[in-house]
Amino acid sequence: YVFQFAHELGHIICGFEQGNQTNQWFEESLCEAASLYALQRLSVVWSNSPPYPNWQSYAPEFAKYRIDRIEGGSYPENFQLHSWWRENRVALSRNAGLRKQNLWIAVKLLSIIEQNPRPSWSACSWLNHSQNGQSKTFEEYLSDWYGACPQTGQKKFVRQVINLFGISTPKDKNK
């Protein structure tokens, strides 16, 4: 339940909107990261301070589920997100529910999120802020997300995501 609840909560945080689904795969990957993050946090918190003393034994189960999920994703050999994304961007834009691939992306996103969770998750609330139902390239989608974030820490997270995908934005090209 925790895993699915965190995933659906991720959609709420991201401001999910019906409409153009071209970049929905990215939101699905963020929501997968939210689930993995929630499992880790519950494992840590419940090992020290469970809601009920007899629930403390569940703490390692959350961590185990997270590990099993990540290890079950079996990355392709020498997986590099930026080059893999360039080769698979059309397939992703056509099918947001490629669960194994969403997991691969989520694990890479999680490595950034866990460095500074608060601004990372708060940045997600701006992900679909400028959605207008029109089709956007992934580069435009991320650029709009960056522009919508009002705080420096949020922008830093989005910039790290942009870099993770090896994307140059118009601002980079003008430097």
Report each predicted region and the residues it spans.
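An acidic intrinsically disordered interaction segment
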Residues: 1-5, 61-80
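Hydrophobic alpha-helical segments and helix-packing faces
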Residues: 2, 24-27, 102
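Active-site recognition of the HExxH zinc-binding catalytic motif
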Residues: 3-19, 28, 32, 36
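Generic structural signal for well-ordered, non-membrane alpha-helices
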Residues: 7-11, 40, 104-107, 111
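Active-site catalytic microenvironments for nucleophilic, acid-base chemistry
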Residues: 16, 37-41, 112-115
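Second-shell loop/turn segments in exported
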Residues: 16-25, 94-96
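Post-HExxH zinc-binding segment in Zn-dependent metallohydrolases
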Residues: 24-71
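Pan-zinc metallopeptidase signature
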Residues: 72-175
